[in-house]
Amino acid sequence: MLMVISPAKTLDYQTPPAVDQYSQPDLLDHSAELIDVLRQKSPLDIAKLMDISDALANLNVGRYADWQRPFTQNNAKQAVYAFMGDVYEGLDASTLGRPAIGYLQERLRILSGLYGVLRPLDLMQAYRLEMGTRLANGRGKNLYEFWGETVTAKLNEQLEALGQRTLVNLASDEYFKSVKRKALNAAIVTPVFQDRKNGQYKIISFYAKRARGLMARWAAERGVADPDQLRGFDSEGYAFDASASDELTWVFRRDRE
């Protein structure tokens, strides 16, 4: 079983990482190509391209200018400790022990617009580049065309190393579109998290994002290898609802009323 999650826009490069262990991203040559494209953009270009404020555009133009190899602990940080946001609050990696972090390093991958695929302990320099950004590049008109089969091939490589044929999709639609489903050598299980509101079960974005991180944490704490075990996920009141689920879409519901 291999899990995938999305990255986050918010980053933390101030808090020291919980562990010293790190790895290097596998696709940095591809990342460098994108950095070259981004460095040709003015702050105004970036603001329009990403629909962000002038202040954020200036911040990220500076990040692209500063981006350089080699990645070290002095100029980069492990991805799972650098990303913030709802998913990562649910995962709360800084409070996980070494065995659980080791589990995530093997069985969790972070999809990224700039880095393609990251392991949790891969060093990462700060950036903003969402997968849905329409950044024209030497391979096409957007990042989906840039990454092509590369992301899928990397996931297949890890699935083969694990000797397993199930990918658990905890990523957003925007990011999972970078995975070529037909080329993926695995069944895709997609957990769906719903909360009861006004008498109906609905996907509430904040809670659903947090729950994705909670599920990854739950699996890491238990060393889950068989995806069927994920049906036992019960963090923060969620429970598997067999009647609302099918073979590949697993619905977890919670009553908050």
Curated annotation (Swiss-Prot):
- Pfam families cross-referenced by the UniProt entry: H2O2_YaaD
Give a GO cellular-component term: cytosol
Q: Which domain of life is it from?
A: Bacteria
Q: Which InterPro entries match?
A: YaaA
Q: Which cysteines are joined by disulfide bonds?
A: none
Biological process GO annotation list? response to hydroperoxide
Listed PANTHER family: PEROXIDE STRESS RESISTANCE PROTEIN YAAA, PEROXIDE STRESS RESPONSE PROTEIN YAAA
Similarity comment: family membership:
Belongs to the UPF0246 family.
HAMAP family noted in UniProt? UPF0246 (MF_00652)
- Output this protein's name: UPF0246 protein CV_1250
What are the top taxonomic ranks of the organism? Bacteria, Pseudomonadati, Pseudomonadota, Betaproteobacteria, Neisseriales
